[in-house]
Amino acid sequence: MDKNLTSMDIRNPGLRSLPPGVERYLVKGGGLSVISLDPDDKIEIIDTEGKQKCEIIVFNKDGKPDCSLLGLKEKDDPKNIKKILSDKNESAFQAASVLKKRNLDVGKAKASILFSENSEAGEKVNLVSKDKCTCIFSAPGNAMKVDEQNPPTDLLLMVKRTKPQKYKDKPNIPEPLVDPLNEIFV
């Protein structure tokens, strides 16, 4: 027997879907995300659909590139991240402005690559931050051609904070799209 569920069937409204201290980020296929980590924060990167590379750049607290903070080896020039940042769309502009505000230079950095074109759906990589750092995670890829079946797919990032109370008092407000021209406090 099928039962139609409605909002009246919710027994405890407003419950958190994730436990305290756990954050979920989605890196869109062909896009990137910038995340700040503290010492001993754990991050799980999940290739949800498979066959999607993950390019990572890590900057230390001084703004210098250092992938070893996540236990990764710097291998390649971050050409995919540079390509995404040079696109003429709103998300690329927003990411570039966040990097500029934090004085992070992608041009001098080396990237680390996780996953491959042969990775399976649901494949996971677990990393632990050794120190305070800012990370750029990208899911690189080209727009799918009409005669192919290989679009860039999303990556899921699950961050487990060691000190969740540190972020409890800070409002979760997104970065502004542009610098404010006039700021008035009332």
Which residues are covered by each model-predicted region?
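Acidic, Ser/Thr/Pro
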Residues: 1-186
